[in-house]
Curated annotation (Swiss-Prot):
Biological-process GO terms, alphabetical: L-histidine biosynthetic process
A Pfam family recorded for this sequence: PRA-CH
GO cellular component, one term: cytoplasm
Function according to Swiss-Prot or TrEMBL: Catalyzes the hydrolysis of the adenine ring of phosphoribosyl-AMP.
Binding residue positions for Zn(2+): 79, 96, 103
EC number, as in UniProt: 3.5.4.19
Gene: hisI
Protein name: Phosphoribosyl-AMP cyclohydrolase
The keyword Cell inner membrane belongs to this UniProt entry's keyword annotation: no
Compartment(s) where it occurs, according to its Swiss-Prot or TrEMBL record: Cytoplasm
Principal subcellular localisation of the protein: cytoplasm
Family of this protein: Belongs to the PRA-CH family.
Length: 129
């Protein structure tokens, strides 16, 4: 397979594209991250999600520290070709570094942000730094 398919994407001026990771079974949105060309290429090659960390300025293989990898079942490109949607099998059932299933665990209710998802596992037990 050639890399021409990467040229179809409307990359940002920084060479990035936002990526939504969605649970393949329930359809729940797990997280939003970023990819550059190399991250997307490695994701396709390995079958596991590899993102670009904007804060650390390096590739980030999801689950490299926690073991909570994302097995990619499908990759979709939106109509404007500037957002990716990954359908994933979330290993360990935890996508968020806070120990929750989803990074979207706060909901606006009556003008206040309310936590709507429990912590599945204490992050101190996940990350041993």
């Amino acid at each position: 397979m050639t890399d021409e398919w990467l040229d179809t994407i409307n990359w940002s001026v920084d060479g990035l594209i936002p990526v939504i990771a969605q649970d393949e079974n329930g359809g729940k949105i797990l997280m939003v991250a970023w990819m550059n060309r190399d991250a997307l290429k490695r994701t396709v090659e390995t079958g596991e999600a590899v993102y670009w960390s904007r804060s650390r300025k390096k590739l980030w293989h999801k689950g490299e520290e926690s073991g909570h990898t994302q097995i990619v079942q499908a990759i979709h490109l939106d109509c404007d070709k500037d957002v990716l949607l990954l359908s994933v099998e979330q290993k360990g059932g935890i996508a968020c570094h806070t120990g929750r299933q989803s990074c979207f665990f706060r909901q606006l209710k009556n003008g206040e942000w309310v936590i709507t998802e429990p912590v599945i596992k204490d992050p101190s037990q996940i990350y041993t730094q």
